[in-house]
Amino acid sequence: MLSIKKANFEDIEKEWAFVRDMPEDENGLTNAWHGISHDDFETKALPDMLRFERGENLPDWMVPETFLFLWEDDTIIGQFRIRHYLNDALREGAGHIGQFIAKEYRGKGYGTKGLALTLEVARTIIPEEEIYLRVNRDNPASLKVMQKNGGRIVKEDEEHYFVRIKK
């Protein structure tokens, strides 16, 4: 059964393996913890994820952010991130939500279902009337995921589509 769960210590082994193996930067979603050791994940990365959600000791440029993992039964197949509100850089940039589906699960509808589950959570957190997303122009699959969840392109530049979804 498909479900979405916040980062937590109870699932540390599977979260660590998933985050460790996520690319450092793919389609605009960065992963500062690519290749991380188990010890560093347990003592630094996972505590940081939980601290980011609480908005504690964030750098000035950062906003609170919730890390969610998409599960199919007992396997993590994706990660979604919800930025709780927008600053100027996010409003003109990455927006509220970042998403990643592991390569072996792409093209099977998991992105669409995962974003739908993430939007349910986001709607309880985000104060803005619309949810902002951005997608690389060379990533039509992610654009389609957003559109299947009610997304509409409101702007584009040479590299990106800027998408909005009604709250």
Outline where the language-model segments fall:
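Conserved acetyl-CoA pyrophosphate-binding loop and the N-cap/start of the following alpha-helix
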Residues: 105, 109-117
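Short glycine-rich hinge loops at helix-strand junctions in the catalytic core
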Residues: 109, 126-127, 150
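GNAT-family acyltransferases
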Residues: 1-96, 156-167
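Conserved GNAT acetyl-CoA-binding A-motif
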Residues: 124-134
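Short coil/turn motifs at secondary-structure junctions
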Residues: 85-87, 104, 138
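Residue-level recognition of the GNAT/N-acetyltransferase active site
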Residues: 98, 102-106, 136
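Conserved active-site alpha-helix within GNAT-family acetyltransferase domains
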Residues: 112, 137-155
